[in-house]
C-alpha cells in the first residue's frame, strides 16, 4: 500500500487505536449498490490511485491553499479561535488529507477501511476534533460544509486525473468511480453526526 510519507502524524489506519465502525459490512455493500458502485469502479479507482500518487501534495495545496483559505467559514477550522494560523496543525492534517486520497483509491473497502471512515468523521465532530494534533481550534466542522465541499473536491480532481495522458474514456471512468466513492464516504460520515445530534447540533 502506497503512503505519502513514512511517518504521518495521528494516522492510525488498521491499528487497534481505531474502534470498530457502527456500520456493518453488509450495510456498506448496500451503500455501494445505492451509489451504483461496481467492480469496474474498483478497477478505475486503482488506476486513479496510480495517476494521483505523485500529485497528492499539489492537490491538497489546491484544495486548502487556493480554495479553503479564501473561504473564511471553512478556513477557520484549522485556525485558533482568534483566527491565528496553526502551521503545525495544517501541515500534519495536510499529510493525512494526502493519504486519504490514496486510501480512497487503493485500499480495499473492508473492515479496516470502514472503521477508518468512522474515525475520519469523528475527528470532524466535537467528540474528537483537535485531539489527534493536540491543538485548540473550532469545536467541530459542520456536516453541511463537509457535504457541500465534496462538490468542489469532485470537480477539481478531474484535471489531476487527466494529467498523466490517460484516454478520455479512462479519465471519465476514474472520475465516475471517485465521485461514487465520495458519495459512499459522505453517507458513512453522516452516521457519526447523526449520533452526535442526540446531544449537539453539528449539522
Language-model regions: role of each:
Residues 31, 53-160:
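Heme-based O2/NO sensor domains and their adjacent alpha-helical segments
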Amino acid at each position: 500500500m502506497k503512503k505519502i510519507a513514512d511517518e504521518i502524524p495521528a494516522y492510525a489506519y488498521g491499528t487497534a487505536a481505531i474502534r470498530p465502525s457502527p456500520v456493518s459490512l453488509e450495510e456498506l455493500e448496500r451503500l455501494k449498490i445505492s451509489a451504483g458502485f461496481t467492480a469496474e469502479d474498483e478497477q478505475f479507482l486503482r488506476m486513479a490511485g496510480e495517476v494521483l500518487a505523485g500529485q497528492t501534495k499539489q492537490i491538497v495545496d489546491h484544495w486548502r491553499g487556493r480554495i479553503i483559505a479564501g473561504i473564511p467559514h471553512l478556513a477557520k477550522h484549522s485556525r485558533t479561535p482568534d483566527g491565528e494560523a496553526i502551521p503545525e496543525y495544517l501541515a500534519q492534517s495536510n499529510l493525512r488529507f494526502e493519504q486519504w486520497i490514496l486510501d480512497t483509491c487503493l485500499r480495499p473497502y473492508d473492515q479496516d477501511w470502514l472503521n477508518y471512515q468512522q474515525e475520519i468523521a469523528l475527528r470532524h465532530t466535537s467528540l474528537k476534533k483537535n485531539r489527534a494534533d493536540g491543538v485548540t481550534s473550532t469545536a467541530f466542522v459542520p456536516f453541511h460544509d463537509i457535504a457541500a465541499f465534496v462538490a468542489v473536491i469532485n470537480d477539481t480532481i478531474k484535471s489531476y486525473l487527466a494529467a498523466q495522458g490517460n484516454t478520455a474514456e479512462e479519465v471519465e471512468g476514474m472520475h465516475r468511480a471517485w465521485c461514487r466513492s465520495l458519495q459512499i464516504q459522505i453517507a458513512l460520515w453522516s452516521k457519526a453526526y447523526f449520533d452526535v445530534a442526540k446531544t449537539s447540533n453539528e449539522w
